[in-house]
Structures are given as structure tokens and as C-alpha cells.
Amino acid sequence: MSDLKSRLKETSNWMSSMFNIIKDPTSESASFSNRVNSVAPPPRRSSSSSSISFSELTNSNENKTTTTTTTTTTSTTATTSQPPQKSPVEQNKEELKKLLQQQLAEMKLKRQGKNSNINDSNNSNNNNNNTDKNKNDNKKEIIKNKKIKEEEESEGEEVEEEEEEESDISDSEDNNSSNNNGSLNGDYDDYGDEISESGSEMDLINNKNLNKEKRKKQEEDLQFSTFDFSSGKAMPTYLMNKGRKTSKKELLEKAEEKERILANSKRNGTNKELADTIRWSTAFDKVQGIKVKDDPALLRKSIKKVEKTKLKSAREWVQRKKEKDEKLKVRIAKREANIKAKIEEKKERRMGIKKKKTNNNNNKSGGGGGNSHASRQRAGFEGKKKFHFNPKKLIN
């Protein structure tokens, strides 16, 4: 039993020395063997920290007797002596209670400070949320106005404006998310309203993108539905050649150059690659259905034909002009003669000279006189008929 007690004391001394090393780093100057063999000094107790040494607890359990001990409290100003009636266990309990009370008071103070900070942060976040709401309302009005403008403007301008709107909305959403994460006790109703508003804006943007895609598809359908290329028929040349039409003289020059290149390649063997490319290009054009005008003889013939038609139209134009001038001259002469005749009539009337009537039987047509043919021309003015229409009866 004595061996066990000695071992227990050694271990308790070693443990107490280790605790003292942790508390007082100055005790490290002593050697380890002295620290193990020596009895552990009583632990220092301050107002801020208190702990029970393992050796004191074991001694109190073995003896089970109340011993009076004097504890010294170190302070900066003065030393005080405690009443010697209390046991170390009771003292430790009281000190622990004091420490707990101090810690609780500190925690309360910290919580009060945190609550004040939280309230300040909540107020700032609420203000930010209100400003964000106003911004979102303004953005909605801007989006509505822009819709009306976008319908009138071109599609390119629509795309630019929508990209700007998307960037603005993404910035506002980032700000909202940062503010909501920073606030611990924010208003959840306001947060829900902001989410619904941002969601509605995103829905509008998605609908716009869908409408754009539909428009593009419709345009593509219009472009490729006007002509059915699935039939395998070649596209006509008047649709292929949208630019300026090349004249026949230019085509003749090109055809002559091609002939010259091909003839040189056959004779001398020069420019074989160029000749092959010319042949392949003409072959591909013919396969595609394009009219290849590379025959110089036919081109010369067509040029002569065009020149002949031009000469013919020029002659006809000159003749027409001559006839027009002659007719104009006749009309002018007739007009001048009529004007002169009217002037002479006026003069004769003033002089009192009466115009003699010319009796031309051929010109008479009414009153029963005159030619039978002239009397038949106007019905109702023939006068009395001296003959019948049937000449056979008259002969009989």
C-alpha cells in the first residue's frame, strides 16, 4: 500500500508540475527531476481564472478532514488574507461561480453589441431593398417604353437594347443577392416580392429571345421557300446574275482570249494548268445549267444582228421624223390660208361687197334637186322621189 501511495504522489506531483508549466512559463528553468521529486506548490488563483490542482483533490479524498489553508491573492495594489475556515473544494466552487457570472455578463454585453450592429445592418439593408424596389419599378417602366420603340426600330437596334437591359438586370440581381445574404433578420416578404419582380423581368427577356428566334426562322423559311431546290432543277440565269450584265463585246474578248490560251497549250504545251481550269469551269457551268457564251463565231453573229437592228430602227426613226415635219408644214400652211380668208371676208363685209354663191349641182343634196346618190346619203331630206329604188321596174 505504501508503494502505491508513493507512486500516486509521484504521478500527482508530475501532473501538477505540468499544469504549472502551462500556467507559469518561468518554471521551465528548473530541471525536470527536481520538478518531479519536489512537492507541487499551490496553484495561483486570480480574479480572471481559477482551477483545482490534482494533488489537492487526492489529499482531500484520502484524509477526509477539514484543514485550514491560507490562500494568497496577487494583485497590483495590495495583498489580502481569506478566512481559514473554508475547504479548498468550497473555495474552488465559489470561484467557479464567480467566473461563470463574469463570463455570462461578458456574453450578454457581446450579444447586446451584436444586436445593435444587426439592427443597424437591418436598417441599412431595408433602405437598400427600398431603393432596389424603386429601381426595379423604374426599370419596368423603361422596359415598357423600350418595347414600343423596338417595334418601330430595326432588329439590329433591338438586339443592342436588349443586351443593355440584360446587363442592367443582372447587375441589379447581383446587388439584391448580396444585400439579402448580408442581412440576418431581414424582411422575408420584401425579399419574396423582389424575387417575383426579377423573375417577371427575366420572363419578359426570355419571351423576347423566343420571338427573335421565331422571326429568324420565318425569314429563313421565306428565303428558301420561294424556290424549291429539292427538285434538282438548275437555277435560272436571270436569278443567278444579279449584278451588271456583261456586254457581248466583252464576252467576245474573253472568248477570244480563252481560244488563244487553249490553242497555245495544244501547240506549245504552255499554260496547261490554266487551260485545264478553263475547261473544268466551262464543264461545271454547263452541268449547273448556266449558259456558257464562249463561241466567238456565234458572238460575232449576234453582234452583227444587233447592229443591223440598230441601223433599221435608225432609218425608221429618220423617216418618221421627215413625215412628221411634212405634216406639220401642211397644217401650218392650211392654218395661215384660213386666217387670210377670214381677214378678207371681214374687209369685204365692211366695204359692203356681198359674196356670190357658187351653184354646184354636185354639192346639192336636199330639196329634190341634185344627184340621186347625194340625195340618198341623208334620210329625211330627199324631197319628193321621182324614181323607185328598183331600177328594173323603171326599165320595164
From Swiss-Prot:
This is Surfeit locus protein 6 homolog. Residues 132-150, 210-220, 341-351 have a biased composition (Basic and acidic residues). Residues 385-396 have a biased composition (Basic residues). The lineage of its organism: Eukaryota, Amoebozoa, Evosea, Eumycetozoa, Dictyostelia. It comes from Dictyostelium discoideum. GO terms for biological process: ribosomal large subunit biogenesis; ribosomal small subunit biogenesis. InterPro entries: Rrp14/SURF6_C (IPR029190), SURF6 (IPR007019). It is found in: Nucleus, Nucleolus. Residues 151-174, 187-196 have a biased composition (Acidic residues). Residues 27-37 have a biased composition (Polar residues). Its main location: nucleus. Disulfide bonds: none annotated. Residues 46-55, 65-81, 114-131 have a biased composition (Low complexity). Involved in a nucleolar function. One of its GO terms (cellular component) is nucleolus.
